[in-house]
Amino acid sequence: MSVNIRSLRHLLGWLIAGTRGGPTRARIIENLKETPQNANQLATSMKLDYKTVRHHLTVLEKNRIISSIGDKYGASYFLSQMMEENYVLFEEILNKLWKK
């Protein structure tokens, strides 16, 4: 899958550093890197409200950072191929944020 690295860097920067929900989205991405999960599993493991997790999953899926399989409640989420291939960009953004 061909992706413009600069555009992806800007998108990830906005999703993670440029919005109030960025830290939560970063945690979701890190969790999904480890293992695919559904919204309820994420909410439980992250100690977050289910609706909050659903909101962030929707944002990440609309921006093609994650993908899903299944319907509604039972849908499992995982990193998209684009995100898997470019995960290092995400790590770079996190490292820059943590150094500040």
Where are these regions (language model features)?
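Short alpha-helical segments that sit at the start of domains
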Residues: 1-26
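Conserved segment of winged-helix/HTH DNA-binding domains
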Residues: 11, 75-100
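Short, Lys/Arg-rich nucleic-acid/phosphate-binding segment
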Residues: 22, 70-76
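Short capping segments at the starts of secondary-structure elements
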Residues: 23, 34-38
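Hydrophobic residues on short alpha-helical segments
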Residues: 26-32
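A short acidic, leucine-rich amphipathic alpha-helix
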Residues: 41-45
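Key DNA-contact positions within bacterial/archaeal DNA-binding proteins
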Residues: 51
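Glycine-centered, phosphate/nucleic-acid-interacting loop/turn motifs that mediate DNA/RNA or nucleotide
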Residues: 64
